[in-house]
Amino acid sequence: MTPKHLEPITAKLRRAGAEVEEFDDAVRVRRTGDILPLKINTMPHPGFPTDMQPLMGVLLSVAKGTSTVTESVWDNRFRYVDELRKMGASVQVDGQVAVFEGVEKLSPAPLRASDLRAGAAMVVAALMADGTSEIEEIGHIERGYENIVEKLRGLGADISKVERVPAALEQAL
């Protein structure tokens, strides 16, 4: 990982009020106070990466004020917004633009990972909420993030994977 390649992301995080430290092969981000609202426009490289948009959307859902995200690269990238709303986020989507009105905190909820990026965003949102959230359809997450549960636990996250018996199989038993 080269921190220089993350410049569009780290610049936005700094603008949101975070402290960002760059090392040779790593970046450390710390919250230093209130999260400030942002305007984000996704762009092809070297602009703000569309793959980071759902994760930034989670951050903006608890920013102090109104943020806008314009998705210029992919259609349907805002599929995660319905899941954030289940957690109490205030987000309105009109075409390729999402407007986030920051709330004080997110609440736990049953969630769904509709794709890889949305799944990562739901994991972060669930970790931000006080209480237990369950995320279904985690295959997307596991495909894109090897050993995510163990890695997040290593960072201090209270996270676990629960194996469920499919309802149809459970009824047959």
Question: Which residues are covered by each model-predicted region?
Answer:
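Short, structured segments at the rim of ligand-binding sites
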Residues: M1-L173
